[in-house]
Each structure stands twice: as structure tokens, then as C-alpha cells.
């Protein structure tokens, strides 16, 4: 099979934004769609478990040896833009901040909010990532996927995808996202779009601990409430377990103070859940995807 290159026993802490992770038995960073598909085929033919990571945000990987193939999509960065129609075709590994700035420079409106999301397009669709009432699903036309069981490649229209708050079926099925078609509003004022994009980024960096390793948001917001607000009301900001700490800037962020391991972080998540449930009667559901754990 052509274009199959991977490394062995790779430390995945280098590929997560929280800087924690175990070792991958096999690891590869495909440069394009063809290489990605070939890797999926190789894993299937060799009976290897296959897991996909993007930017590594919203991801907690246990400090264990992970058998099988781990694919990181961050080199899959192709973007094709039809400026007149607003249709944008992006590979799964395109970073949202990169896409946001490109859209603004092309006068395409509707992606300004994504500048503050430290994830890839594929990961963001899979997790249905968003900010307040916005999510990438709002702009989605279709997703191109490969089935890891049948190896069939297909295109799924948005109407056939059951998106929910911070959830998509891709979290549970065998379909891996290759690329997506998105629609943005053309003929926007470039100067205004760039200004809005920069304001959105500044708001994020002023209120969230971007200078330290973190997941992004740890918990989903409960109905008519905010996880960060609940955590702050209990005086938990700054609370630590090992090298893991609840951010003093934002209650819904856990930061790694250079030596945290996966147990520290999982224990801290559990303590937060217990305290909020005990004091507020609300169970906080993690937004973080967990690999290598029996959770929940």
C-alpha cells in the first residue's frame, strides 16, 4: 500500500493542549486526504484499532500504552474557497483560528467567533464545538467521511446528522471525518470582519488561561446555567490536585502546572463533579473526550 509512514511508541503528551498523554504504539500525521485514507485502510487490513486526534484540545489521554494506530490530522490543511458563493471546502486538520482569519480576509462573514476555538475543523464538527449559541454545525453543508469498518467513503448532508449541544453522532459511530463543506455569507466588509475577529480573540485571551496548557472548557454548560459560574461560586478556583489546577482566570478551565498526569486531572474533574452535585444539585457532564479510561 502506498504512502504509509508511521512512527512507533510516540509520546502523545506532545500532541495534546493539556500536555498529558500516554504512548501510541503506532502514530502518523498524514499530509493530505489520500494519505489519511491509506492509513485507515492499513489499520483495517492489519486489525489495528484506529483513533483520530486533531489539535488535541478537549482531549484527555490516559498515561498508558495505547495499542493500535493513532492518526493526527493537523497536516491536513487544504482550504478551497469560492468567494462569490461563500462555499468553503476544508480538510479535517484545518485549525479554526486559521480558517477564521482567512475567511475575514476573503470577506466571508460568519466565522469570526471561531478564532478563539483552539481546535481543528474535524474535531470541532465531531464534538460540535462552539461558543455561546454558535457552533460550526450552523455553517455546515456536508461532511465527507470514511467508515473504518467497511472502508466506504461517503458524503453526508447536514440534514442527516443529528447534532446536539456539544454532541454529534461521529463521537459514537465508525465514521471518521475527512473534510467538510461549509457556507459563509459572502461580500462582507473585510476591515470590519478583521476587527471583529481580533476583538473576539482578545476577549478569549483576556478571560481564559491561553498562556498555560489546558483543554479549553472542561464541562458542558448545564441548562440555563454556566459550569464556570457554578465552580466559581463554590470557591474552587485555584484548587489543585498534583499538577492539575482549576484556573484562577476561569472556573471551567483546568490547567497543567508543568507536571500534571492524567490521574491528577481525572481526579480533579471528579472532585469538581462531586462538589457541584453536592452543593448545587447539578451534575456537570464533561465536554472533554477521554481516551484510555473506563469512563464514566
From Swiss-Prot:
Pathway: Cell wall biogenesis; peptidoglycan biosynthesis
Subcellular location: Cytoplasm
One Pfam family recorded for the sequence: FAD_binding_4
InterPro entries in the cross-refs: FAD-bd_PCMH, FAD-bd_PCMH-like_sf, FAD-bd_PCMH_sub1, FAD-bd_PCMH_sub2, MurB, MurB_C, MurB_C_sf, Oxid_FAD_bind_N
Cofactor: FAD
Keyword Cell division: yes
Any one GO molecular-function label of the UniProt entry: UDP-N-acetylmuramate dehydrogenase activity
Principal localisation: cytoplasm
Catalysed reactions listed for this entry: UDP-N-acetyl-alpha-D-muramate + NADP(+) = UDP-N-acetyl-3-O-(1-carboxyvinyl)-alpha-D-glucosamine + NADPH + H(+)
Enzyme class: oxidoreductase
BP GO terms, sorted: cell division; cell wall organization; peptidoglycan biosynthetic process; regulation of cell shape
Active site: 166, 217 (proton donor), 287
GO cellular component: cytosol
Keywords: Cell cycle, Cell division, Cell shape, Cell wall biogenesis/degradation, Cytoplasm, FAD, Flavoprotein, NADP, Oxidoreductase, Peptidoglycan synthesis
Residues of the FAD-binding PCMH-type domain: 19-203
EC number(s) given by UniProt: 1.3.1.98
TM spans (from-to): none
Function: Cell wall formation.
Family indicated by similarity: Belongs to the MurB family.
PANTHER family tied to this protein: UDP-N-ACETYLENOLPYRUVOYLGLUCOSAMINE REDUCTASE (PTHR21071:SF4)
Name of the protein described by the UniProt record: UDP-N-acetylenolpyruvoylglucosamine reductase
Organism field: Prochlorococcus marinus subsp. pastoris (strain CCMP1986 / NIES-2087 / MED4)
Amino acid at each position: 500500500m502506498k504512502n504509509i509512514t508511521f512512527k512507533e511508541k510516540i509520546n502523545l503528551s506532545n500532541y495534546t493542549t493539556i500536555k498529558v498523554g500516554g504512548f501510541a504504539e503506532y502514530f502518523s500525521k498524514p499530509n493530505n486526504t489520500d494519505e489519511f485514507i491509506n492509513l485507515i485502510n492499513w489499520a483495517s487490513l492489519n486489525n489495528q484499532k484506529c483513533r483520530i486526534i486533531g489539535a488535541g484540545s478537549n482531549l484527555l489521554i490516559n498515561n498508558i500504552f495505547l495499542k493500535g494506530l493513532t492518526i493526527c490530522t493537523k497536516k491536513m490543511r487544504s482550504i478551497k474557497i469560492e468567494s462569490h458563493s461563500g462555499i468553503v471546502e476544508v480538510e479535517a486538520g484545518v485549525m479554526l483560528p486559521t480558517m477564521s482569519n482567512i475567511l475575514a480576509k476573503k470577506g466571508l462573514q460568519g466565522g469570526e467567533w471561531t478564532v478563539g476555538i483552539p481546535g481543528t475543523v474535524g474535531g470541532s464538527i465531531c464534538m460540535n464545538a462552539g461558543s455561546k449559541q454558535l457552533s460550526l454545525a450552523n455553517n455546515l453543508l456536508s461532511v465527507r467521511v470514511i467508515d473504518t469498518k467497511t472502508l466506504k467513503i461517503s458524503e453526508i448532508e447536514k440534514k442527516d446528522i443529528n447534532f446536539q449541544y456539544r454532541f454529534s453522532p461521529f463521537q459514537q459511530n465508525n465514521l471518521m471525518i475527512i473534510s467538510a463543506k461549509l457556507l459563509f455569507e459572502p461580500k462582507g466588509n473585510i476591515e470590519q470582519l478583521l476587527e471583529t475577529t481580533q476583538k473576539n480573540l482578545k476577549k478569549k485571551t483576556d478571560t481564559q488561561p491561553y498562556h498555560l496548557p489546558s483543554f479549553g472548557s472542561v464541562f458542558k454548560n448545564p441548562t440555563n446555567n454556566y459550569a464556570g459560574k457554578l465552580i466559581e461560586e463554590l470557591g474552587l478556583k485555584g484548587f489543585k490536585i498534583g499538577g492539575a489546577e482549576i484556573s484562577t482566570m476561569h472556573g471551567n478551565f483546568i490547567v497543567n502546572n508543568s507536571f500534571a498526569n492524567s490521574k491528577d486531572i481525572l481526579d480533579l474533574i471528579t472532585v469538581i463533579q462531586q462538589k457541584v452535585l453536592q452543593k448545587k444539585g447539578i451534575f456537570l457532564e464533561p465536554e472533554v473526550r477521554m481516551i484510555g479510561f473506563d469512563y464514566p
